[in-house]
């Protein structure tokens, strides 16, 4: 059941979608404001912008106009949902199911010609929204996605001063100090150490019990042994509870393995605290002009970071900082819009899938 009051400015189509719970009043207000500021009179453009705002609430940073109708109808065809709705909402949903939607091809052409929407080649912040292939973004989120893709690719391409041979030698030395009998890294774990030691960004992916914490401890030990001048190490996670778990897990695992303690890694913070969150309107203390003072940054539960927060983190990472992202692909998604894809990093062999 929708609890939103339908805005007076809503067209019949937008009003029906709002009553059915597909759109919120805020979605309609945003789309109306953008169209008014950009002198856009096409109702299909206002519909697309309102649906793009809706997609943000659903966890996606973009709208695909070609598939949104099927997506919405599938979501509305939920027996559990229908059992909770009142008669007004049920009637509105029936109207949505019978509603005539814009023809996808014509809709795309209209969006391409809109004064409110930039294309992929336009300058940054030229217009409030942007159409990139079949994806319609609000400009901020398109820029964040571009920042993440560009910065991750750059970090993955940059090799560190540690060679493969040096990494292998140091790893053998570290394994000799481990006091657990018969301890031996498997092929995936060795690849994880090599990726983290020889690249400025690496991703350790795996579910519970795949040894992610053990690998973080060994990687940090290898980095410390390979570089006697290794400076500050930061441990971080999206939430305070996750950061505390990471700190405790690294400390206990390092002790159990008999690894040398790393005092610089004894503290853990949220990603917001790491970046120096200064409150609404003030942004972060650390950014591309004032970068983080760490040699290594480990981020646990990285799969829960939003695209926007990852963009801010990558902006604040300098050329000499190693970033180690740890995550479970089956974890809950970010509470904010967008999830980060690491697919393009696989070509650089910096994404390691750990298995039990």
What is each of the regions a protein language model found here?
Residues 348-356:
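Positively charged, low-complexity/disordered segments
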Residues 2-349:
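Conserved ATP-binding/catalytic motifs of P-loop helicase motor domains
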């Amino acid at each position: 059941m929708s609890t939103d009051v339908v805005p007076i400015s809503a067209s019949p189509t937008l009003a029906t979608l709002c009553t059915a719970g597909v759109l919120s009043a805020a979605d309609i207000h945003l789309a109306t404001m953008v169209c008014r500021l950009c002198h856009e009179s096409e109702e299909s453009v206002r519909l697309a912008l309102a649906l793009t705002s809706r997609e943000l609430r659903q966890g996606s940073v973009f709208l695909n106009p070609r598939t949104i109708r099927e997506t919405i109808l599938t979501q509305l065809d939920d027996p559990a949902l229908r059992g909770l709705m009142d008669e007004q909402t049920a009637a509105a949903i029936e109207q949505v199911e019978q509603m005539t939607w814009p023809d996808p091809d014509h809709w795309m052409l209209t969006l391409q010609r809109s004064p409110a929407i930039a294309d992929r080649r336009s300058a940054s912040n030229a217009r409030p929204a942007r159409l990139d292939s079949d994806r319609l973004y609000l400009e901020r989120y398109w820029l964040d996605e571009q920042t993440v893709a560009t910065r991750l690719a750059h970090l993955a391409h940059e090799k560190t001063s540690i060679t493969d041979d040096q990494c292998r030698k140091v790893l053998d030395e570290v394994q000799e100090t481990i006091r657990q009998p018969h301890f031996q890294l498997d092929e995936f774990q060795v690849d994880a150490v090599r990726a983290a030691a020889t690249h400025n960004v690496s991703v350790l992916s795996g579910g519970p019990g795949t040894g992610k914490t053990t690998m973080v401890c060994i990687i940090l030990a290898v980095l410390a042994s390979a570089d006697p001048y290794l400076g500050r190490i930061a441990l971080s996670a999206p939430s305070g509870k996750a950061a505390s778990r990471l700190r405790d897990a690294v400390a206990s695992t390092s002790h159990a393995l008999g690894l040398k303690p790393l005092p610089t890694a004894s503290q853990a913070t949220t990603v917001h605290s790491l970046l120096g969150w200064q409150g609404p309107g003030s942004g972060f203390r650390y950014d591309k002009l004032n970068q983080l003072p760490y040699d290594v940054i480990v981020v646990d539960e990285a799969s829960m970071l939003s695209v926007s927060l990852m963009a801010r983190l990558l902006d604040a990472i300098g050329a000499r900082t190693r970033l180690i992202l740890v995550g479970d692909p089956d974890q809950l998604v970010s509470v904010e819009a967008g999830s980060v894809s690491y697919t393009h990093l696989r070509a650089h062999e910096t994404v390691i899938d750990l298995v039990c």
